[in-house]
Each structure stands twice: as C-alpha cells, then as structure tokens.
Amino acid sequence: MSHMELALDPGDHDLLGFLLEESGGLGAAPDEALTSPPDWELPLSESLSDWDVEDFLSCLPSPPAVLNVFSNSDPCLVQHDHTYSLSQEHVSIDLDNESYEKERAQMTPLRVEEPADQEIARLILTEEEKRLLEKEGLTLPGMLPLTKMEEQVLKRVRRKIRNKKSAQESRRKKKVYVGGLESRVLKYTAQNLELQNKVQLLEEQNLSLLDQLRRLQAMVIQTANKASSSSTCVLVLLFSFCLLLVPAMYSSDTRGSLPAEHRVLSRQLRALPSEDPPQLEPPALQSEVPKDSLNPELQAASNSCCLFHLMPQAPRAEPPLQLPLPDGFSGCSCPDSISPLHANLTREEGWLPTPSPTSVILQGRYSG
C-alpha cells in the first residue's frame, strides 16, 4: 500500500472528498485518511513547497481526466459557496491499490483514442512527390511530425512540382498562342493570295478597257474625218452649183434690162397691093423677116442692102456708092425676085417710075 503525503488545510478536506467521490470508489481513502491517527502528519520542515505540490499534481495520470470530466459536466455542479485555497500545511494521503486500479480503468478509454489521432496525422504523399523523392534517393516517414530536414526536403519537392506545373501551363498557353498565330498567318496568307488574284484580274480588265478606249478613239477620229470629207464634198458641190447657176440667172436678168440705145432698129418693108395686075411683088418683100433674130446686125445689113437696090435713082446720075460690108454680109444679096424690077428700070434708060407706082412702107421694129 502506497502512502502519499499532502499538506492540507482543514477547509480542504471537503474539496478532497468531493474529488474522490467524483472519481469513483475513491471515497474510502479520504475517510481512512481522516480517521487515521494524527501521528502521520509531518512537521513543517519536512512539508513540500507549493511548487513541489504542483509538480506532483501534474505528474499524476488522473487529473487530466478529472479535469475533462469537470469541464464537460454541468456548470451547476461547480458553483459552490466555498472558496478553496491551498494552505501552508501539508498532509499525506495513502491510496490503496484498488483505488489506483479503478483510476487506471477509467483512463484506459482515453489511451485507446490516441492511435486514432496518430492515424489522422499520417503523412500523405502524391505519386509525383513519391517519384521525385525516389529519383533524389530520399525517403520520408509515413507519420508526422517530421524533422526540419525532412520538412525542407518535402518543401523542395513540392516547389519543384509547382514549378513544373506552372512551366507546363505556360508551355500549354504558349502552344495555344503559337497555334492561334499560325492559324492567323495561314488565314491571312490565303486572303493575300485571293487579293493578289483579284488585283491581277482587275489589271487585265483595266488593260482590256484601255484597249477598247483606244479603239473607240480611233473610230471617233475616223468618223470625224469622214464627216469632214463629206461636208467638204457637199460644200464643193454647192459652190460649183452656185457658180453654174448664178451666171445663167445674171444673163437672163441682164437681157431683160438692156438700155434702149443698144437696141437695133429693124425695118420691115411691106408692099401695098398695086393696080397693075401683071406686076407682081417680089417674093422677098412678101416674106416677112423673122421677128426673133439672133443677130440684129446681120438683119440690119440685109435690110439696108435690099433698100439700096430698091431706092430709085435720078437719070444720068452717078452710080451709087458701094459701101464695104463685113465678111458676113459679103455673100448677102437681094432676092431673085428683085432682079426683074431692076431690069425693067434699066430698060427704060432711066430711073423713071412705072405707070403703076408701088408704095413702100417702112416699119420700124425694135429687136432686142
């Protein structure tokens, strides 16, 4: 039987009894301790100090469980009117084996729960971390806590894994970006080729339009030359027609408006019927001179010639003067019907009038 000595104040006996009652079948020990003779009390010199008592209480296995019970119990059980304080006196308490075994029986459930806490604190590593640790030739325990070296190794491995993941992510983003750029380059290259084809087609159309424009200009120039040549031809024809028409119109106008001094006096001889029937008029006198004579000088010459032969002459007179006539009138002679009259006059040896004189009328006529 083990004896524990405690220095207690008389007011602390109630507290100790309460603690023993709450702890189970430990109530007999305080009774025995109280009923024990007072010879077990030690002198003050041999009593423990306050610090020793605290160390002793902290070494006891039961106080944590007892304190947990008090903390989890109803607060009404803790509230008392008593005030407890440790005194300077120390008492010794003897605890038998039965009470100690009961305390151990109550503490066993708490000791069973400790392995569960250790399982929760087990170190869990990923496959990547295990592979890197194996690659570096390091091993970590499967349970916590770890030493500082092991923690540094674990941090270094996890840092490498994070850097690797970030590098992979950056490479993935870069690959996506480069792929987007390549797709854009291919797209813009296709568009550039299409635009080049369009530009080439437009250049060909421009050249064809320029060729058509040159042809149209040549056609316009040709039509302008043809129009100018046709207009010149028309103008030449009109001018020639005017040149041909104006003189004819001028000649007809001038013929109608000749002055009177240029008119030729034409005379026509007409013989009246005589009383002598055998005497006939010369046929030349019976025939009238045509009115519309184109040459009035010729007509005047013929008339004068006829008059010259018909004029009576005085006897023993000189022969008449013969005037020179133009070449056109050199062959002109009076008609043959006048020759008998002239012969008759000469036969009578003188220009004597016949018994039946013939009257001659001179009639003036304008011919223009």
Curated annotation (Swiss-Prot):
Motif segment (LXXLL motif 2): 57-61
Membrane topology (Cytoplasmic): 1-229
Subcellular location as annotated: Endoplasmic reticulum membrane; Golgi apparatus; Nucleus; Cytoplasm
Ranges for domain bZIP: 153-216
Any Gene Ontology CC annotation: membrane
Pfam families: bZIP_1
Reported tissue expression: Expressed in trigeminal ganglia (at protein level).
Motif (HCFC1-binding-motif (HBM)): 81-84
Lumenal side, ranges: 251-368
Sugar-bearing residue positions: 344
Biological process annotations from GO: chemotaxis; establishment of viral latency; induction of positive chemotaxis; positive regulation of deacetylase activity; positive regulation of defense response to virus by host; positive regulation of monocyte chemotaxis; positive regulation of transcription by RNA polymerase II; regulation of apoptotic process
Spans annotated as Transcription activation (acidic): 1-95
Processing and modification events after translation: First proteolytically cleaved by site-1 protease (S1P) that generates membrane-associated N-terminus and a luminal C-terminus forms. The membrane-associated N-terminus form is further proteolytically processed probably by the site-2 protease (S2P) through a regulated intramembrane proteolysis (RIP), releasing the transcriptional active processed cyclic AMP-responsive element-binding protein 3 form, which is transported to the nucleus. The proteolytic cleavage is strongly induced during dendritic cell (DC) maturation and inhibited by DCSTAMP. That form is rapidly degraded.
Site entry: Cleavage: 266-267, 269-270
Region (Basic motif) residue spans: 155-184
Region (Leucine-zipper): 186-193
Short motif (LXXLL motif 1): ranges: 16-20
Membrane topology (UniProt): Single-pass type II membrane protein
Residues that span the membrane, as ranges: 230-250
UniProtKB keywords: Activator, Chemotaxis, Cytoplasm, DNA-binding, Endoplasmic reticulum, Glycoprotein, Golgi apparatus, Membrane, Nucleus, Repressor, Signal-anchor, Transcription, Transcription regulation, Transmembrane, Transmembrane helix, Unfolded protein response
Molecular function via GO: chromatin binding; DNA-binding transcription factor activity; DNA-binding transcription factor activity, RNA polymerase II-specific; protein homodimerization activity; RNA polymerase II cis-regulatory region sequence-specific DNA binding; RNA polymerase II transcription regulatory region sequence-specific DNA binding
Record function comment: Endoplasmic reticulum (ER)-bound sequence-specific transcription factor that directly binds DNA and activates transcription. Plays a role in the unfolded protein response (UPR), promoting cell survival versus ER stress-induced apoptotic cell death. Also involved in cell proliferation, migration and differentiation, tumor suppression and inflammatory gene expression. Acts as a positive regulator of LKN-1/CCL15-induced chemotaxis signaling of leukocyte cell migration. Associates with chromatin to the HERPUD1 promoter. Also induces transcriptional activation of chemokine receptors.
Record family assignment: Belongs to the bZIP family. ATF subfamily.
Assembly behavior: Homodimer. Interacts with HCFC1; the interaction is required to stimulate CREB3 transcriptional activity. Interacts with CREBZF; the interaction occurs only in combination with HCFC1. Interacts (via central part and transmembrane region) with DCSTAMP (via C-terminus cytoplasmic domain). Interacts with OS9. Interacts (via leucine-zipper domain) with CREBRF (via leucine-zipper domain); the interaction occurs only after CREB3 activation and promotes CREB3 degradation. Interacts (via C-terminal domain) with CCR1.
Protein name: Cyclic AMP-responsive element-binding protein 3
Organism: Bos taurus
